[in-house]
Amino acid sequence: MNKLLFTIPMVFFLSLASGQAQTKKASSTTTPKSVSVAQGEVARWAGNCLRCSFEKRAWSAVNGTCYYPVDMDMKPGHYTISRRTTGGKLETATINVAEKACVQEDITNFPKKEYVNVSPQNQARAAKEAAVVNPLIRYQSSLRPAVFDLPVGKPANSLPKGEGNFGACRTINGQPRDRHTGQDYPVGVGTPVLSVGNGRVLLAANQFYSGNAVYIDHGNGLISEYFHLKSYSVKPNQTVTKGQKIGFAGETGRVTGPHLHFGVRWHGACINPGFLLIDPADMQEVK
C-alpha cells in the first residue's frame, strides 16, 4: 500500500518534468519569416539592414531597410530573400509572389498609322534603341550609392490619379503588343515634368516608341523613366536634383493623346512606380 502511494507521485513528477521540457523546446522555436506580394510590387524588411539579396542578386540597404522589387513578369511562387544586419547577423525569409491579373487594353482606330504596321526601317530603329537602353536598366552588381529617399517626389506638380494601366496587356487594332511598363498620368501638353529624386541622367533622346524620353539613375539600382515628352531640357551625365524640371509633357511616340508615362526599374525589375510614391511603411513588410 505504501509502495503504491509512493509510485504515483513519482510518475506525476516525471510527467510534469517532461511537459516542461517540451514547452521550453517549443518556445525556443521561432516561426519562419515571410511576406506576400503580387507581381510588380515591392516588399520591405526594416531594421538595421546593411545588405539585401533576392534570387542571386544583392544590393545595399536604403537607410537601414531592405527593399525587394518584384518584376511584373516574375513567375508566381515562393522565393528566398535574405538580409545582413549591422550586427553581422544573416537572416532569411520567404517572399510569396502572387499573380497580378493583366488589365486588357484594346486600342482601336489608332491615329498614328506608322505604329500599326511598323516598317522594316522603324523596326530596325527600335531594335537599335533597345540595344542602348537595355544595358542601362538591367540589374548590375556594381552600383552607385543611393541618392534618393522614399517616398520619391512626384513626376509632376498636382499629379492626377494614374490611369491604373501598369502592366496592361495591349492590342492595337487587334494586333498584340508588349505589356505596358509604366503608369500613365493624364497631364496636358506643356506640363512641367520633374525628376522624382536626386540622380544622374543616363539618357535623353528621341525614340521611336517612347518619343522624347529621359532616363535617370538615382543610385542603388533605381532608374526612373519619363516618356512621350514634348521636349526635354537635360542631357546625359547631367546631375539633377529632386523636383528639378527635366522637360515638358507631350504626345510624342506611340500615344493616342497627351499624357506622362512614368516608369521605374529597380535592380532590373520592372515595378509599378506608384509603390515608390507611397509611405514605405505602407508596403508589405517581412514578419
Where in the sequence are the language-model features?
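Bacterial N-terminal signal peptides
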Residues: 7-15
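Sterically constrained small-residue positions within well-ordered secondary structures
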Residues: 12, 36, 59, 72, ...
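Catalytic cores of peptidoglycan-degrading enzymes
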Residues: 155-287
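Local alpha-helix boundary/kink/capping signal
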Residues: 15, 75, 151-152, 279
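Surface-exposed, glycine-biased beta-strand/turn segments
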Residues: 94-210
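Cationic-aromatic interfacial patches
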Residues: 22-103
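Sec/Tat signal peptide C-region and signal peptidase I cleavage site
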Residues: 17-21
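Positively charged n-region of N-terminal signal peptides that target proteins for export
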Residues: 1-6
